[in-house]
Amino acid sequence: MSEEQFGGDGAAAAATAAVGGSAGEQEGAMVAAAAQGPAAAAGSGSGGGGSAAGGTEGGSAEAEGAKIDASKNEEDEGHSNSSPRHTEAAAAQREEWKMFIGGLSWDTTKKDLKDYFSKFGEVVDCTLKLDPITGRSRGFGFVLFKESESVDKVMDQKEHKLNGKVIDPKRAKAMKTKEPVKKIFVGGLSPDTPEEKIREYFGGFGEVESIELPMDNKTNKRRGFCFITFKEEEPVKKIMEKKYHNVGLSKCEIKVAMSKEQYQQQQQWGSRGGFAGRARGRGGGPSQNWNQGYSNYWNQGYGNYGYNSQGYGGYGGYDYTGYNNYYGYGDYSNQQSGYGKVSRRGGHQNSYKPY
């Protein structure tokens, strides 16, 4: 059973990193605008199978709620070749026509979904999200109406039932854009490594904007790590293709560095692919409290070189906690079924992919 999805979904997002996804790449993801209603609890028992492992999961999770193809509407409105400003306005308008539908039965088909919601207005398109491993429904999908008034009609109805299940329709809106990641953390660096040597090595990947060499407050000596900021995001992507880099005489571990705001945003939307996959927690390495006294960066696990399971600002552990709750829509994808629950497993994610 292959996943039913829209023809234009693939153009909705570009490949990049999870947590460090660039602004344009993250505009496609959607979050629920309304709080969970009673129907969510009622529908939670009907959901779909578990998520995919490794890179497959990263791509699927990252694209959940991606922009539904509304090319027909764009052509009708004359937006197909419009300016970027008009394109953004059209995209914002289309958000008013979309709905997230949770609590679906595993037996619900795309036709069932379209037939049910067509009584509220013309349905331009709809999709069901399927588990890429089992091919079974994950218990949620998306509906795109031709007019926003249809969404209002759906929301005005107190309860919705489809295939014997109480379902949970919600308005959907675009996720907030994310800042591009231009800064990296370099761990395991010898305090004796000259700044010129650091700049020379990392300058080979792209133009370095600044290098931060934190000092130990007690000894007034350099500590065993640094932060490097680049002019662009591309050098960070290149560097993150390898976990370890030899800088001078040191074998250094590289991780994406996030500000407190970026970290909180990443936690809000859940761990995702790209950079995250390359910083998976594991054992080993000397124990150094690197992050102590360096409060400009949220506690991302830099201080624990023992690689705890939740270290590195949500990069470790690989449990997809943000994805389990599906951006606030409720847990429709990780539910027990007659087939049993498909366990979530860690894995290497190489890029951000559309579903």
UniProtKB/Swiss-Prot annotation:
Phosphoserine: residues carrying this PTM: S71, S80, S82, S83, S190, S271
Modified residues (N-acetylserine): S2
Coiled-coil residue windows: none
Location of the region described as Disordered in the Swiss-Prot/TrEMBL record: 1-91
Residues bearing the modification N6-acetyllysine: K165, K243, K251
Annotated positions of the N6-methyllysine modification: K119
One Pfam family in the UniProt entry: CBFNT
Reported modifications of this chain: Methylated by PRMT1, in an insulin-dependent manner. The PRMT1-mediated methylation regulates its phosphorylation.
One GO MF term: chromatin binding
Localisation per UniProt entry: Nucleus; Cytoplasm
Cross-link (Glycyl lysine isopeptide (Lys-Gly) (interchain with G-Cter in SUMO2)): K72, K129, K197
Top-level taxon of the source organism: Eukaryota
Biased composition (Basic and acidic residues): 64-73
Dimethylated arginine modified-residue sites: R345
GO cellular component terms attached to this protein's record: cytosol; glutamatergic synapse; mCRD-mediated mRNA stability complex; nucleoplasm; postsynaptic density; ribonucleoprotein complex; synapse
InterPro entries to which the protein is assigned, alphabetical: CARG-binding_factor_N, Nucleotide-bd_a/b_plait_sf, RBD_domain_sf, RRM_dom
Subunit structure comment from the entry: Identified in a IGF2BP1-dependent mRNP granule complex containing untranslated mRNAs. Part of a complex associated with the FOS mCRD domain and consisting of PABPC1, PAIP1, CSDE1/UNR and SYNCRIP. Interacts with IGF2BP2. Interacts with GTPBP1. Interacts with EIF4G1; the interaction requires RNA. Interacts with EIF3B and RPS3.
Protein name: Heterogeneous nuclear ribonucleoprotein D0
Organism lineage: Eukaryota, Metazoa, Chordata, Craniata, Vertebrata
